[in-house]
């Protein structure tokens, strides 16, 4: 009898056939044919091994190329389950505003928050600050990837909400989108949300220039630790309802300390380097 035949006979002797529930439960998760149906539009169910491979591959890829938003998004979803995204969902359920957000399911796009309206708001309002930041950085709220690798539909929305609120965090803190600013914000987000991807992103400091690295560890990482530990859960902020609120007042309410202005620091460094270069040329 062949090896396959002996294995089949052994299974039959124990009452197990390829069609039996015990075997099907083992085989089904690893079969593309038997992959469970999606639980919401765009959902891609993954096996444990597939999720692990996605987590490792996307983490390495995003470290090599921090501008790959798709890899960063995939890493965030693959590493958020099974615990961390549920913790964030539970934080919303335990908060009155968080529960309203989960019930209403608002989305942040250029249609739900028209730029013309945001630009018309008072100068120091949350909405005007958000619009000014978007204009300065040249980004749009419509560029966020849709969640697809989180199985629970409600948790998928929580991740989508975090993702779409990310630019509000940028605007309130004033941090820019280049690598140094993103690292500072990700460190802050990790201590506020505990989403693993935000913590893993910090390792991208190896891509910083020596001066940027020194600045990150001496200025912005300490800021991220202070504000991240002291601040309230940002996932429970209903941004759409506070667009006219004074942004300084909001920072005080959320216990967010404004970090050193990276753009001003860089500008001062360039001016200093220019003056030093001119001085050396005059001495030559």
UniProtKB/Swiss-Prot annotation:
UniProt KW keywords: Lyase, Membrane, Metal-binding, Mitochondrion, Mitochondrion inner membrane, Transit peptide, Ubiquinone biosynthesis, Zinc
Residues that hold Zn(2+) according to the record: 166-167, 170, 182
Keyword Membrane (UniProt): yes
Top-level lineage group: Eukaryota
Stored InterPro entries: Coq4, Coq4_euk
Keyword NADP listed: no
Membrane topology type: Peripheral membrane protein
Pathway annotation: Cofactor biosynthesis; ubiquinone biosynthesis
Catalytic EC class: lyase
Annotated transit peptide: 1-30
EC number: 4.1.1.130
A single GO cellular-component term on record: extrinsic component of mitochondrial inner membrane
Protein location: Mitochondrion inner membrane
Reaction catalysed by this enzyme: a 4-hydroxy-3-methoxy-5-(all-trans-polyprenyl)benzoate + H(+) = a 2-methoxy-6-(all-trans-polyprenyl)phenol + CO2
Family: Belongs to the COQ4 family.
Subunit structure: Component of a multi-subunit COQ enzyme complex, composed of at least coq3, coq4, coq5, coq6, coq7 and coq9.
Physiological role: Lyase that catalyzes the C1-decarboxylation of 4-hydroxy-3-methoxy-5-(all-trans-polyprenyl)benzoic acid into 2-methoxy-6-(all-trans-polyprenyl)phenol during ubiquinone biosynthesis.
Matching PANTHER family: UBIQUINONE BIOSYNTHESIS PROTEIN (PTHR12922), UBIQUINONE BIOSYNTHESIS PROTEIN COQ4 HOMOLOG, MITOCHONDRIAL (PTHR12922:SF7)
Protein name as it appears in the record: Ubiquinone biosynthesis protein coq4, mitochondrial
UniProt gene name: coq4
